């Protein structure tokens, strides 16, 4: 059987909203930020699971036979982490889908317009007929995500591509959704400032999770 499909899903769960509130607080320490992002990734994976194919099964309990379900799409999922900001986000997703294959990509966006993107590392499994889940905490201008999608074209054609965000800008969503990509997010905000950051957003997710780099 198939779950319900959608293009954009805003997660409005009360627990997720509380987690989002916590990680947006100025002065949050890295450990607490990572923990909150991991939790959000896990809850988002639960929502996403409702769209996967499944079948009815029967299992033997100590006292008889019970009806249940089995997700048949589990072995088709490929998770993609974007260094370094998405690592705790992907960790949460992997708690729900531990058997998923895992790819890693290094992408860097310049700090000034036109916010060019460079891809300096990519290691991903074969993507043909897979369900590709790209976890990136922030979708601001959309340049990084578009650059990643273009870089992945050389690695196969997924049956479905899904983007997980914690916060998305309207601009970024418009660009990604035009490509037929499903997007899950916890919040949609209108403003992207001159530095390419979502406002009010939450700041630089990579720096918040791991500290500011020296370079």
Swiss-Prot record:
Uracil binds at residues 198, 203-205. Its EC number is 2.4.2.9. The keyword Nuclease does not apply. Allosterically activated by GTP. Pathway: Pyrimidine metabolism; UMP biosynthesis via salvage pathway; UMP from uracil: step 1/1. Belongs to the UPRTase family. This is Uracil phosphoribosyltransferase. It comes from Methanothermobacter thermautotrophicus (strain ATCC 29096 / DSM 1053 / JCM 10044 / NBRC 100330 / Delta H) (Methanobacterium thermoautotrophicum). The lineage of its organism: Archaea, Methanobacteriati, Methanobacteriota, Methanomada group, Methanobacteria. The gene is upp.
């Amino acid at each position: 059987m198939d779950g319900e499909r959608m293009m954009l899903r805003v997660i409005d769960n009360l627990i997720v909203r509380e987690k989002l509130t916590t990680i947006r607080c100025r002065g949050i320490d890295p450990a607490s930020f990572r923990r909150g992002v991991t939790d959000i990734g896990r809850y988002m994976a639960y929502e996403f699971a409702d769209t996967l194919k499944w079948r009815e099964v029967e299992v033997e309990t100590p006292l008889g036979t019970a009806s249940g379900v089995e997700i048949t799409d589990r072995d088709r999922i490929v998770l993609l982490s974007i260094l370094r900001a998405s690592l705790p986000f992907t960790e949460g997703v992997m708690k729900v889908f531990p058997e998923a294959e895992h790819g890693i990509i290094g992408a860097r966006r310049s700090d000034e317009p036109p916010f060019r993107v460079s891809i300096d590392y990519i290691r991903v499994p074969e993507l043909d007929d897979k369900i590709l889940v790209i976890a990136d905490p922030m979708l601001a201008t959309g340049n990084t995500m578009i650059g990643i999608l273009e870089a992945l074209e050389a690695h196969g054609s997924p049956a479905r591509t899904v983007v997980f965000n914690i916060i998305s800008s309207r601009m970024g969503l418009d660009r990604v959704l035009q490509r037929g990509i499903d997007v899950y997010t916890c919040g949609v905000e209108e403003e992207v400032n001159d530095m390419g950051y979502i406002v009010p957003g939450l700041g630089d997710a990579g720096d918040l999770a791991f500290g500011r780099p020296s370079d």
